[in-house]
Amino acid sequence: IKATGEGIMEMTVDTPKVRRSILPMVIVAMLFFVLGFATWLNGSLMPYLKQMLQLTPLQASLVLFSFYIAVTFTALPSAWLIRRVGYKNGMALGMAVMMLAGLLYIPAAQTQTFGLFLLAQLVIGAGQTLLQTAVNPYVVKIGPEDTAAVRISIMGILNKTAGVVAPLVFTALIVSGFTAPADATLTADQIDAMAASLVLPYLGLAAFLGLLGLAVKYSPLPELEKESDTGTGTDQLKAVLAKPALVFGVLSLFVYVAVEVIAGDTIGLFAL
C-alpha cells in the first residue's frame, strides 16, 4: 500500500510472489482431492466386496477398520519421516505407498482373497496418513498466516467434493455392468466377473498415483524449513498433555471422525 500525490491510498500486489504461490496451491489442491477420493472410496468398496466375497456384515466392516487403523500406528512414524526427508519428499513418498496399495488390489481381485484386500486397505491407509501428515501443515505454511484458514477451507471443500465424485466413478467403472440383485446367490462366473471388473480401474488408479507422485517430486514446490526438535519425546508428550484444550480437541475429533465414518461409509450396506 502506498500514498499517491493526491493523498489516495493505492494497493499494489506483488505479482511474482502471487504467481509463485499459485502453482504450489494447485498441486496441493490435487493432493487434497486424492485424499478425499481414497477415503470416500471405502463406502463403495465395502458393500461391493461384501457381495462379491459373500461376507458377513462384521467381515465387511473390516474393510473400513483396516483402512482407518493405519492412522493409529503410522501417524507418529509419518511425522518422524517427514522431519528427516522434508514435506515435499514426504508427499511424494505418501503417493508412492498409495500406488503400491493400488497394485495390491489387483492380485487381491484375481485371487479373490479377502486378506489381500485388507492388506491393500491397510497400505493405502498408511500412504494416505503419510500424505496427509505432510500436506496439512504445508497448506498452512505455504502462504501468509492470516489467510491460512481460507486455504484450509478451500482444501476441505475439495476433499469433500471428492467424496461426491468417488462413488460416481466407482459406479461408472465397476458396478454399471453388474445387474444381479443384492440378495441373489451369485454364480462362480458372476463372482469372477465382479472380481475382474476391479483390475483395470485399480491399475489405472495406481498409474495415476505414481505419475502424481513423480510430479510432486520434480515439481517446483518450495521445501519448507524443518522444525527443530525441542526436548525428548517424553518432554513433548508432557507438553501436549499439559494443554487440556488440545487433548479434548483431539478426543473430539476422534469421536467425530468415528461418527462420520459410520454414517457415510456403512450406509451402503443398508442399500444392498
What does each model-found stretch correspond to?
Residues G7-L31, K238:
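Cytosolic juxtamembrane N-terminal segment immediately preceding the first transmembrane helix
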Residues N42-M46, A242-L272:
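Extracytoplasmic gate region of multi-pass secondary transporters
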Residues F170, I174-P181, L203-D229:
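C-terminal membrane-cytosol helix-exit motif in multi-pass small-molecule transporters
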Residues F65-W80:
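Central cavity-lining transmembrane alpha-helices of secondary-active solute carriers
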